[in-house]
Amino acid sequence: MQDVNRLKLVLVEQKKTSKWLSEKLGVSQSTVSKWCTNSSQPDIETLARISKLLGVGMEELFNKKFMESV
């Protein structure tokens, strides 16, 4: 599977954990873990919430190569 998002990297850059994000979003840690490993992807509304929580633009959450392919 292609790496679609950079969520794991952005969390590290922001010094945040997947546990922190799961608590803020009200989802399980396993869900956030799947997003971080690109085994599944959050929906667009959740991506918008994530970008707001992390203070980054939504485009920063996507892998550049993926964005170039769409």
Model segments located where?
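A short, Lys/Arg-rich alpha-helix, primarily the initiator
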Residues: 1-17
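DNA major-groove recognition helix of helix-turn-helix/homeodomain DNA-binding modules
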Residues: 45-60
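The alpha-helix within a helix-turn-helix
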Residues: 11, 22, 51
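Short, charged recognition helix plus adjacent turn
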Residues: 9, 15, 34, 60-70
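Recognition helix of helix-turn-helix/homeodomain-like DNA-binding domains
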Residues: 27-42
